[in-house]
């Protein structure tokens, strides 16, 4: 047996022995009739204590004689004979406990406390003081075991190092990784901040179906499920767009939804099949109004959550404080491929030749607009590091967007890029029912030609448009990618609590 295999076998043996010992301790607690008590109540969390009392000197704390109760997980313990120091971790952070044998009821220190394990959940009561090193601590007068942990924590110095284990056992990642905990706190703050921002601008939050008879609102491959009661195949939604615009037809002039979308596509550092989007629709507005709204939203979130408008990300710093750059799609192609003759982007054969020269395989179903879009994605997208709006998307790749009044081959649409990736997509909505019907038919033709991401024909949505959709603008923002930016995370799995994973066999 190799040394590595021997070490692995020893580790398994050690773990099995520890599991056995911990279960024996739980059995003893069961015999005492109190394995999982539920009558302990705390009055503070660790962050509240630090915020209120870190600035006070020990003499002041002694004079105030403040008694508190806390609860959390025992992360470290230093036993020094008749006294010990414990680090207790709760939702707000960590607080130190000073546990002395003679300050607890008889037998608690030696017969109970010393037999507890790291990872156990404790309740503690006592008075605040500061150690000689100035650390805020609780001098315990009561200490109780609230939950016995049957499995040990990850190594306290190295945490959960295996990346896949972090995703599969997110609970361990959250216990042992301060950075991971902070990421999801920031995510929650972003969600709350978006809602506050939207409501402040007069939008109403709504919910639309997650299971749909016809998936629409985006070009993507859907998941298929079956409704037993209706004996009907249905699709998990790829976007809420068409339902939200039905609500605008119905008279709700400003609506938004934050919820999950599902796309049966690949997994990467930027893509998870199940992801969170915020979509909004605003009557009597156009895409330019949404550009202003998007800038304001990101600037507000950065200032409110991070306290600044400059957001560090890897080697870059995104500046949300200054006006975002705005380029048309063709301007972006020219900027990042200077040799491009702009006239070639107006000719199918010339554009196809450019695409093929940079390694793009042009499909038979593609028209000029799709080819130009593919060229943009290949030569320009990765260079859009600072916040940038790209406008004038071809109508061919924008089946739900309003055509431009001057050039009907393009639409009043933008996509929003930061760090070389798309974060949001917005446009003036197509409200011409006949034009929409024709574009749906074009999508059907593309699907029949082999494009499995082309949209379905949604007759009911066309009927809704025939009742009259006011001039409207719509915007979708990927929440997961937004959180990545605000938390300096470089894979989408780091900002989704439970990302899609292949089951362990």
Curated annotation (Swiss-Prot):
It comes from Citrobacter koseri (strain ATCC BAA-895 / CDC 4225-83 / SGSC4696). Binds 3 Mg(2+) ions per subunit. Its main location: cytoplasm. InterPro entries: Aa-tRNA-synt_II, aa-tRNA-synth_II, aa-tRNA-synth_II/BPL/LPL, Lys-tRNA-ligase_II, Lys-tRNA-ligase_II_bac/euk, Lys-tRNA-ligase_II_N, Lys-tRNA-synth_II_C, NA-bd_OB-fold. This is Lysine--tRNA ligase. The lineage of its organism: Bacteria, Pseudomonadati, Pseudomonadota, Gammaproteobacteria, Enterobacterales. GO terms for molecular function: ATP binding; lysine-tRNA ligase activity; magnesium ion binding; tRNA binding. Homodimer. Its cofactor is Mg(2+).
